[in-house]
């Protein structure tokens, strides 16, 4: 019995050893671990550190502290007679003398903010005694980032719903349109003054520090906020590699283009409506499928706050902006070239217009205007005349020779 069990144990041990050996040769041993909080990370071998945002920020009258990570809450400590503005419906709890707390609903520039798609309903909380409040958001995949403004550097908040709470008597927040940048102008807010800001982002929020002379390319849907510098961010597109296959051309498309039926059909309202629908579908595809090809280029010195979960391109770009970045409809470049060169139909000669009408009205248009002109010149150069029973060829001079003389 012992021998049998020993043989069985030996067989099982050898089978397990063989399986382990097979796994060692077939699979690579990879270890994935999260970076410690606050540790600097080198990006692609370039000395451009990416670090987590500070968990707390304090001023003389208030203090913001982020509790928990990544799905966190914001702890706000307010001194006496200090105002706290938080988005409506985000206040979780409050500690202190509740009888002294005054809460009012503030409507901040509803006309301008509604046009830009920025929330304008905020809750104003103040108390003559010190209090502590907890603020959170309804979305389960957001995290907080706190920013301390000392009056020397201004900030631009890119995402529409990124601003959650702020405090500071001299803090000024206004919606802005950056005319130099048409990609992320809608929903941006410029923050000036002194105070504390609480921003929220999808996923984790990280901070990127750029020194003078450094550049960074970021997707607009991942940028939460950035510091205002002398050089605003510019739209940027990576060079794409396309494979173009050359197929031997046929004369069928050229014959179809010469057909009068095809020309009349392309000039009809049905064709134009179908082309507009196709252009709208192409715009939607570029916004949803190829929208990741649109980037922003930042120049240092600057500080960027990026989120790990990007927003949709629809949230930061309008249809008009996508159409401007995408290719223009067919025919626009041709019309622009005609205006530039001044070649219009009115400038053409009577002979040119008559020749084009003759070629287009022919049942089988197998000749071009140039070919018809050459043919007419060849026929008009010589003529046969019968004189005294003999055939004589008399040559006539062309109009160009007469003009030269």
Curated annotation (Swiss-Prot):
Keywords: Mitochondrion, Transit peptide
Transit peptide region: 1-88
UniProt xrefs under Gene3D superfamilies: Mitochondrial biogenesis AIM24
InterPro entries, per database record: AIM24, AIM24_sf, Trp_RNA-bd_attenuator-like_dom
Pfam family, one: AIM24
Domain of life of the organism encoding this protein: Eukaryota
Intracellular or extracellular location(s): Mitochondrion
GO CC aspect terms: mitochondrial inner membrane
Any one biological process term the GO annotation gives: inner mitochondrial membrane organization
PANTHER family from the UniProt entry: ALTERED INHERITANCE OF MITOCHONDRIA PROTEIN 24, MITOCHONDRIAL
Similarity remark: Belongs to the AIM24 family.
Protein name as it appears in the record: Altered inheritance of mitochondria protein 24, mitochondrial
UniProt source species: Talaromyces marneffei (strain ATCC 18224 / CBS 334.59 / QM 7333) (Penicillium marneffei)
């Amino acid at each position: 019995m012992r021998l049998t069990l020993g043989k069985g144990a030996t067989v099982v041990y050898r089978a397990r050893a063989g399986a382990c050996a097979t796994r060692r040769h077939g699979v690579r041993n990879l270890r994935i671990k999260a970076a410690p909080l606050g540790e600097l990370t080198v990006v692609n071998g370039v000395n451009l550190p990416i670090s987590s945002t500070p968990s707390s920020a304090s001023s003389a009258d208030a203090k913001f502290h982020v509790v928990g990570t990544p799905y966190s809450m914001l702890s706000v400590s307010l001194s006496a007679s200090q105002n706290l503005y938080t988005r409506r419906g985000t206040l979780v709890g409050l500690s202190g003398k509740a009888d002294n707390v005054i809460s009012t609903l503030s409507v901040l520039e509803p006309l301008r903010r509604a046009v830009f798609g920025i929330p304008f309903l905020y809750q104003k909380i103040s108390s003559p005694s010190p209090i502590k409040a907890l603020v959170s958001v309804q979305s389960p995949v957001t995290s907080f980032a706190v920013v301390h403004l000392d009056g020397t550097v201004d900030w631009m908040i890119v995402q529409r719903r990124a601003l959650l709470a702020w405090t500071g008597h001299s803090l000024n927040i206004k919606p802005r349109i950056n005319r130099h940048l048409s990609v992320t102008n809608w929903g941006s807010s410029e923050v000036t003054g002194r105070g504390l800001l609480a921003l929220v982002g999808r996923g984790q929020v990280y901070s990127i520090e750029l020194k003078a002379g450094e550049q960074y390319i970021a997707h607009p849907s991942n940028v939460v906020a950035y510091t205002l510098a002398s050089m605003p961010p510019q739209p940027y597109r990576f060079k794409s590699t396309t494979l173009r296959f050359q197929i031997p051309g046929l004369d069928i498309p050229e014959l179809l283009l010469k057909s009068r039926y095809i020309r009349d059909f392309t000039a009809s309202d049905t064709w134009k409506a179908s082309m507009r629908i196709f252009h709208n579908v192409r715009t939607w595809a570029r916004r949803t499928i190829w929208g990741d090809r649109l980037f922003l280029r930042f120049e240092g010195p600057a500080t960027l706050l990026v989120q790990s979960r990007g927003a949709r391109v629809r949230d930061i770009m309008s249809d008009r902006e996508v159409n401007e970045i995408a290719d223009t409809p067919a025919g626009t470049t041709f019309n622009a070239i005609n205006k530039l060169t001044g070649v219009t139909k009115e400038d053409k000669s009577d002979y040119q217009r008559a020749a084009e009408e003759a070629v287009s009205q022919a049942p089988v248009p197998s000749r071009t205007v140039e070919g018809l002109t050459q043919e007419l010149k060849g026929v008009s150069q010589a003529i046969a005349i019968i004189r005294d029973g003999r055939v004589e060829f008399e040559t006539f001079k062309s109009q160009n020779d007469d003009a030269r003389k």
